[in-house]
C-alpha cells in the first residue's frame, strides 16, 4: 500500500492560515505528501525544511530538493528542531507541523520489522542505521521493565503475562515469532484487532523514544513560532493525543486568579491559543482506513 498523507488539506490549510510566504517546518517528512502540498501553495520566496530519520524518507526528500530549491531536508529527529535550525541561522518560523504516524511503507515493508501482519526481521527502528533492533532490545530488557512498557505504551492489560512469555522464549528473530508468542499468551482478543497490536505499538514507541521526542519537540516548536505562527500536529493513538492536548492546554491557560486580578506579566505568559481539533472525514476513512484514529490539533502562537 502506497503512503497516503492523512488530513492532508486540513493540516496544510490550518498551518498556512491564508499566508503564502515565510518559513515552514515539516517535522516528520515521511514520503513528503504534506510538504509537497505546502510548497504548491507557497510563493517563490518561501522556504520549507523537512526533518526525518528514516533512510527511505531521506531518499525521497533528496529527490524533492532537486525538484524544488525552496525545500531542504535535515537528517535528524524533530526533537533536535531548534538546534538544527539555529545552526542554519533560523530562529523564527511561520509554521511547524508533525504527522506522528508510522508511514504505510514502514508498516508494509516486511524487512523494516514494524508489522505483525508480515513476517520480517524484528527491527522496528525508524532510523535503522543506529540503535538496538527490537530483537536486541527484547533480549536485554528485564521482564518487569518490559511489562511496564507494554502496559504504559500499549495500554495492554495483559502486559505481565505477555512480558513473561517473551522473556521465557529467549532470542526472537522475526515479527511472526513475536506476534505468535503474544497471540498465544493473550487470553482475550479484542474484536477486529490483532492481539499483538498493543504490544507491537509499545515496543516501537520505546525503541524509537517516540513520546520522549514529542515532549522535547513541542516546547521547541512553540519557541520557534513567530506571533500568529501555527503549530499543527496529527496523532494516531491516545498516548500521543493526550501529550499534545495537555501541552496546548498548559500553554494556553491562564494561571489561577488569586482574586485580585492577574498581573499583565502572567496574562502575557500564555504562549498559545487553541485553534481547532479535527478528525478524518468519513470519506477519508473510507478511502484510507488507517486515517480512522487520526486527530489534528492546531494552535497559534500568541506572544
Curated annotation (Swiss-Prot):
Signal peptide: none annotated. It comes from Acinetobacter baylyi (strain ATCC 33305 / BD413 / ADP1). GO terms for biological process: rRNA base methylation. Keywords: Cytoplasm, Methyltransferase, rRNA processing, S-adenosyl-L-methionine, Transferase. Pfam families: Methyltransf_5. The gene is rsmH. HAMAP family: 16SrRNA_methyltr_H. SUPFAM superfamilies: Putative methyltransferase TM0872, insert domain (SSF81799), S-adenosyl-L-methionine-dependent methyltransferases (SSF53335). GO terms for molecular function: rRNA (cytosine-N4-)-methyltransferase activity. This is Ribosomal RNA small subunit methyltransferase H. PANTHER family: 12S RRNA N4-METHYLCYTIDINE METHYLTRANSFERASE, S-ADENOSYL-METHYLTRANSFERASE MRAW. It is found in: Cytoplasm. Its EC number is 2.1.1.199. It catalyses: cytidine(1402) in 16S rRNA + S-adenosyl-L-methionine = N(4)-methylcytidine(1402) in 16S rRNA + S-adenosyl-L-homocysteine + H(+). InterPro entries: RsmH, SAM-dep_MeTrfase_MraW_recog, SAM-dependent_MTases_sf. The keyword DNA-binding does not apply. S-adenosyl-L-methionine binds at residues 32-34, 52, 78, 99, 106. Belongs to the methyltransferase superfamily. RsmH family. Specifically methylates the N4 position of cytidine in position 1402 (C1402) of 16S rRNA. One of its GO terms (cellular component) is cytoplasm.
Amino acid at each position: 500500500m502506497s503512503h497516503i498523507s492523512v488530513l492532508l488539506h486540513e493540516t496544510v490549510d490550518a498551518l498556512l492560515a491564508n499566508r503564502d510566504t515565510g518559513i515552514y517546518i515539516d517535522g516528520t517528512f515521511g514520503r513528503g505528501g504534506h510538504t509537497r502540498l505546502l510548497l504548491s501553495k507557497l510563493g517563490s520566496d518561501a522556504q520549507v525544511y523537512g526533518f526525518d530519520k528514516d533512510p527511505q524518507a531521506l531518499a525521497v526528500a533528496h529527490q524533492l530538493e532537486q525538484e524544488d530549491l525552496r525545500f531542504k531536508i535535515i537528517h535528524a529527529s524533530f526533537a533536535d528542531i531548534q538546534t538544527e535550525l539555529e545552526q542554519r541561522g533560523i530562529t523564527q518560523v511561520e509554521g511547524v507541523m508533525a504527522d506522528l504516524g508510522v508511514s504505510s511503507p514502514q508498516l508494509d515493508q516486511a524487512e523494516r520489522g514494524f508489522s505483525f501482519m508480515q513476517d520480517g526481521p524484528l527491527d522496528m527502528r525508524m532510523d535503522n542505521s543506529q540503535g538496538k533492533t527490537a530483537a536486541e532490545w527484547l533480549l536485554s530488557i528485564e521482564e518487569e521493565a518490559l511489562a511496564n512498557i507494554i502496559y504504559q505504551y500499549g495500554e495492554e492489560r495483559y502486559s505481565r503475562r505477555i512480558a513473561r512469555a517473551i522473556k521465557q522464549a529467549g532470542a526472537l528473530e522475526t515479527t511472526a515469532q513475536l506476534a505468535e508468542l503474544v497471540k498465544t499468551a493473550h487470553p482475550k482478543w479484542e474484536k477486529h484487532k490483532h492481539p499483538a497490536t498493543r504490544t507491537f505499538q509499545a515496543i516501537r514507541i520505546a525503541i524509537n523514544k517516540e513520546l520522549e521526542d514529542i515532549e522535547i519537540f513541542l516546547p521547541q516548536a512553540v519557541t520557534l513560532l513567530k506571533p500568529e505562527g501555527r503549530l499543527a500536529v496529527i496523532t494516531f493513538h491516545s498516548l500521543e493525543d493526550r501529550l499534545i492536548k495537555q501541552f496546548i492546554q498548559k500553554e494556553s491557560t491562564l494561571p489561577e486568579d488569586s482574586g485580585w486580578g492577574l498581573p499583565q506579566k502572567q496574562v502575557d505568559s500564555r504562549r498559545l491559543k487553541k485553534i481547532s481539533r479535527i478528525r478524518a472525514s468519513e470519506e477519508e476513512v473510507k478511502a484510507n482506513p488507517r486515517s480512522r484514529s487520526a486527530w489534528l490539533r492546531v494552535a497559534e502562537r500568541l506572544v
